[in-house]
Amino acid sequence: MDAPTLSELEGLRYSELQKLAKTAGLKANLKADKLLKALKVHFYPESKDESPDSDGCTSLTDTDELNSSQEKEEPVSVSFVTHRRGRGRKPLQNQAIPKDEFLSDSAGVGSESLASEIDNTQDKDCLESKKKEVSLPILDNKHKKRSRSQDTSKQNNSETTEKRQKKASNVSSIPSAGKIPRYVGRLSKPGSKPSTPNFKKLHEAHFKKMESIDKFMERKQKRLDAVSSSIQEVKMLTKKSNLLKLVEKTPVSDIKKPVKSRLSLLSPLPRTTGASPSRTPMSRRRSGRFSTANKSILVDRSGFKPSVLSSSKMNVRFSEATKDNEYKRSLIKTPARKSSSFLPITPKSEPRQTLSSIKKTDLLTSPEKAKKPDHNTTIQPSPAITESPCQQNKANTPFKFMAQNTETPNTNKKGSFDLQASLSRPLGYQPHRGKLKPWGESKENKSGSNSNVSVLKNNFKQPQLQTREERRKQHELDRKGKRDQALGTRRGVPVK
């Protein structure tokens, strides 16, 4: 059998290649590219001697590239060899760079990824050199096109080298990759590590910023002084304005008079026969000077005039006000005790007088007292006592109650007690009329209660149980009480 040429081998179909391999005694159950390579080695062993260190992938890539170039030249190719698409290696856009040039350009860049790229480019250079050796028996027009493609690839290589140099210069600024993982290196920096703050220092800094209590109190006092001073100034201005208004309204001689009247209100002066200084004109009292806002606190402002002038004559019976114990008529009024304030009165003399009437009689003169009618307790002033128009304008100062028994000249004298005179006077209470209750019933039966208590004291740990006899006695008593009540209701007698 004649050995086919290389071009004939490449133009055969896969089935024909298998038949050829079987006839040659080779393994036919292989892929197309490997089967073609095995046939070439079998029929042309010198091609193997020329490239002893060539890998199996070189011939495959050569055939792929040749077929691709033939397809570009002739859309309808003569070869009937079926090729597996997508399995072959695609040529890289950035072609190979010599290792020495790259190392010289990127000096100081010792990254593992760059070294692996250099190894890959070296392998590709080896493949290209082998492709050139294999493609010697191809036609001249193919060689021409190949040379053109190589020229374009060289231009591309020069461009890529420039780009790589630029990238290498940029990479040199980036630190070299070490064995530390990606994010662990950042944690080793002192600034980036989140550390717990020193709270003691923080608290001290805040405490220094704080204000001391003494300074705070000083500042508070200053603020209060400023506010109070402004208020005092306003008060002083209002007082001055009020004084100026009063000075404009009243003459200078009248301004000094109210001072005396104010003093007389506090402590009354002794009486004189002339115009008493304790009396002040009514018009003066009603002036703006004596308004409620300007009155002294010490003066009794209320118009209260005490009816009781002695503490011994105070009424302490509250049943009249509360209307309690109305059925006890005898207890509402009790005989008044004998007081030193009452005068001794004979049977033919006047009836009893109150303390107020006695006081008023003392104020009157002796000849006026003689002219008074006998049976009138109230005082009617005589024409000699009537006040003049100038005295009527003057008002009496209010009486100050000192809670002391007032002493008059007549009450100081102790008179002898007259029994007939006191009996002749009417009673000041309602006496009891009717039969009195027997004395024994009102008394409490203390003996029974005492005996009962003594029994309880003696037997406090053993309580007395009610026996059958005691219960029978109690039942008999209850029946007797019911019988008596029924009889009383039948006869119309109320039974308690």
Swiss-Prot record:
Give the residue ranges for region: Disordered: 44-206, 250-294, 338-496
| Annotated InterPro entries | NuSAP (IPR026756)
Q: Which domain of life is it from?
A: Eukaryota
Ranges of Polar residues composition bias in the record: 56-69, 150-159, 376-396, 403-423
Q: Which GO terms describe its molecular function?
A: DNA binding; microtubule binding
Q: Which GO terms describe its biological process?
A: establishment of mitotic spindle localization; meiotic cell cycle; mitotic chromosome condensation; mitotic cytokinesis
Q: Name one Pfam family in it.
A: NUSAP
Query: What cellular component terms from Gene Ontology apply here?
Result: cytoplasm; microtubule; mitotic spindle; nucleolus
Transmembrane among keywords:
no
Q: Does the keyword Cytoplasm apply?
A: yes
**Covalent S-S links between cysteines:** none
Q: Residue spans with biased composition (Low complexity)?
A: 261-281, 447-459
Instruction: Kindly list the places in or outside the cell where this protein is found, as annotated in its UniProt entry.
Output: Cytoplasm; Nucleus; Cytoplasm, Cytoskeleton, Spindle
Q: Where is the composition biased (Basic and acidic residues)?
A: 121-134, 467-485
Give the UniProt keywords, A-Z. Cell cycle, Cell division, Cytoplasm, Cytoskeleton, DNA-binding, Meiosis, Microtubule, Mitosis, Nucleus
PANTHER family, per this entry? NUCLEOLAR AND SPINDLE-ASSOCIATED PROTEIN 1
Q: What does this protein do?
A: Microtubule-associated protein with the capacity to bundle and stabilize microtubules. May associate with chromosomes and promote the organization of meiotic or mitotic spindle microtubules around them.
- What is the protein's quaternary organization? Interacts with DNA, microtubules, ipo7, kpna2 and kpnb1. Microtubule stabilization is inhibited by ipo7 and kpna2, while microtubule bundling is inhibited by kpnb1. Active GTP-bound ran causes dissociation of ipo7 and kpnb1.
Q: Which family does it belong to?
A: Belongs to the NUSAP family.
Tell me what this protein is called: Nucleolar and spindle-associated protein 1-B
Write the gene name. nusap1-b
